[in-house]
């Protein structure tokens, strides 16, 4: 850049402002604008070169041109900031245009959750039994072999102990006993009975696990088991308690209940409990609903009690089974497929 004097420098400064305005206006994005800025305001920019050339002028001209160059710098910076703002606004407008909301589209409903039908049954069962004086037990889902089988009078060669029916865990407890996923909620009753003195009146609802899966069985399912032990409990008490429970749960006073002789290692005598509706889609059909019986003397001993003094009854029902009958569901697997269309109907 060559200068003849202050007049030529003044013309050059004015021309630089015009050039900067054109260059900035031509910049289509932030990167191009920064490149244009460097051409005028950078370390090697045109204004920097002019400032270095002031040394060739006399003091009066240096003062005059210095002021003019600083004024030009302010003008160029103002043009730069204005273009930056314009580019930023254009970018924002483009983004907003691409994110335009079509207000004519139907709105989305609130994604409010609901209580699972099996949990509804769980809560209802607890409420009914609490109302007649039963406590509610809790316990671990990973159990030892003794509490799950031996304490309940299951012999070592019982089929339920096989790996085809039980999920075993490759670990042992502190006493060296094999661990497994509990196959029923009876272990909670064992633990409760060994920690409490008679009379013992408790239900044990919870998750259980067995190697089984079809329309009416699941590898994980829910059970509720009941236990009442005292000095004067009879089979008649079992019939009265469970019949009243079913009639309350299904809200049907005309529901018919029968007890069929059966066998379970932990009760003697044992009975399957069937029920029959006298109205509705299941009218006239006998439906198996529970297993029950008088607690076996050996099980009473394993509770730490004297079977000559204490007697009691026990029962066990599948919560999924109760839920299926209450709501008319035919396939247990529907409860766990996560189909909101199916689950939502229980919360309407």
Swiss-Prot record:
- Is Aminoacyl-tRNA synthetase there in the keyword field? yes
GO MF annotations, alphabetized = ATP binding; magnesium ion binding; phenylalanine-tRNA ligase activity; tRNA binding
Q: What is its main location?
A: cytoplasm
Pfam families to which the protein is assigned, alphabetical: Phe_tRNA-synt_N, tRNA-synt_2d
Q: Which GO BP terms apply?
A: phenylalanyl-tRNA aminoacylation
Residue runs in coiled coils: none
Q: Which cofactor does it need?
A: Mg(2+)
The protein's assembly and partners = Tetramer of two alpha and two beta subunits.
Concerning its family, UniProt says: Belongs to the class-II aminoacyl-tRNA synthetase family. Phe-tRNA synthetase alpha subunit type 1 subfamily.
HAMAP family per the record? Phe_tRNA_synth_alpha1 (MF_00281)
The protein here is known as: Phenylalanine--tRNA ligase alpha subunit
Gene designation: pheS
